[in-house]
Regions:
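A short, acidic, amphipathic alpha-helical segment used as a generic capping/interface helix at domain edges
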Residues: 219-229, 235, 239-245
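Glycine-rich beta-alpha junction loops
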Residues: 117, 134, 196-203, 241, ...
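Generic structural signal for well-ordered, non-membrane alpha-helical segments
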Residues: 31, 35-38, 74-81, 85, ...
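Zn-dependent metallopeptidase/amidohydrolase metal-coordination segment
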Residues: 240-271
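His/Asp/Glu-rich mid-to-C-terminal helical/loop segments that flank catalytic regions of hydrolases
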Residues: 262-289
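Intrinsically disordered, low-complexity segments enriched in small residues
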Residues: 19-22, 199-205, 277-286
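Active-site rim beta-loop-alpha module in soluble metabolic enzymes
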Residues: 154-227
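Metabolite-binding pocket within alpha/beta catalytic cores that recognizes anionic/polar moieties
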Residues: 1-173
Length: 289
């Protein structure tokens, strides 16, 4: 039996942070960062059967063209992803009454609809990127004993050597996306590559306001990294954590990002709302097929 201090439930039986009960979650889940983006996704649903919000975790469950979907906001960063993925898995794979893992496990399809900055000049603003891999520059995933079983160790070693990575920042980890789900979401409209996941927005992504960064050349090193044809395409704050936890728990996960900025060209989208809407429509259509 899982202890009450480990699997925390609210008085209504919902799981602690995301405030959901098992029947309120679809098998296909869309993750967004911003709670305000949840209604922008569910606005396309045929119906909304359930909605709730607790802190930054806003959820709508409904259907799109007959496909039952849940969209949930995660907030920002790998730490929040740790909460959301673990609690979603608990809802489908742990009996909340007996506090025992189920014998028959459910594999979720988890898709992130995000925004990101491009690291390559040929991936312009207003385009879409599917993350073939997530490259984590945080340390969250190393908390889990079995993380080496799902990591791309050779690619990690190549990245560490290429960047002369400072070991004080912890070892980067690389996880591939869910291959079955990727087949449904990758078309000729979408670029593909490695997505870097930073543990912060400023220093960890090379931004300098008043504090100097440890490696001012990091973004140039990210831009030039290529391992067996896999290159870095974009930088954000969630994908590697989604991929790592999903793979350990037996779920399929893919991250789709709308590119709103391009570092090499110094350009920024003229219409963030439109490119996000375009990504939402694209993702929903592919999931409904």
């Amino acid at each position: 039996m899982i202890k009450e201090s480990e699997l925390i439930l609210n008085p209504d039986g919902s799981i602690y942070h995301i405030n959901l009960r098992p029947e309120q979650v679809a098998d296909t889940i869309i993750l967004v960062g911003d709670p305000n983006r949840v209604p922008r996704v569910s606005a396309y649903f045929d119906n909304i059967e359930f909605s709730t919000q607790k802190r930054e975790f806003c959820t709508h469950t409904g259907s799109y063209k007959g496909k039952r979907l849940t969209v949930i906001s995660t907030g920002i960063g790998p730490d929040n992803i740790d909460i959301v993925i673990n609690e979603l898995d608990a809802l489908v794979n742990i009996d909340l009454h007996t506090r025992q893992p189920k014998e028959q496990l459910t594999s979720l399809n988890i898709v992130r609809f995000g925004t990101s900055g491009s690291l390559q000049a040929d991936i312009p603003v207003d385009s879409f990127v599917l993350s073939s891999h997530g490259l984590g520059m945080d340390n969250m995933f190393h908390s889990y004993k079995d993380s080496p079983k799902v990591r791309e160790i050779a690619m990690e070693e190549a990245f560490i050597a290429h960047t002369s990575w400072n070991p004080l920042k912890g070892r980067p980890y690389i996880i591939a996306c869910g291959q079955e789900l990727k087949k449904r979401l990758l078309t000729d409209k979408v670029f593909e590559g490695i997505t870097g996941t930073a543990p912060g927005f400023y220093g960890p992504q090379g931004r300098v306001l008043r504090l100097p960064v440890q490696d001012p050349d990091l973004n140039d090193k990210l831009h030039s990294f290529n391992h067996n044809g896999h290159r870095m395409t974009n930088l954000e704050m969630e994908t590697s954590a989604i991929y790592g936890l999903s793979k350990l728990l037996g779920h399929q996960a893919v991250s789709l990002n709308a590119i709103i900025a391009n570092s090499p060209t110094g350009t920024f989208t003229k219409d963030t709302k439109k490119v996000v809407e375009d990504l939402i429509v694209y993702g929903l259509e592919q999931l409904a097929k």
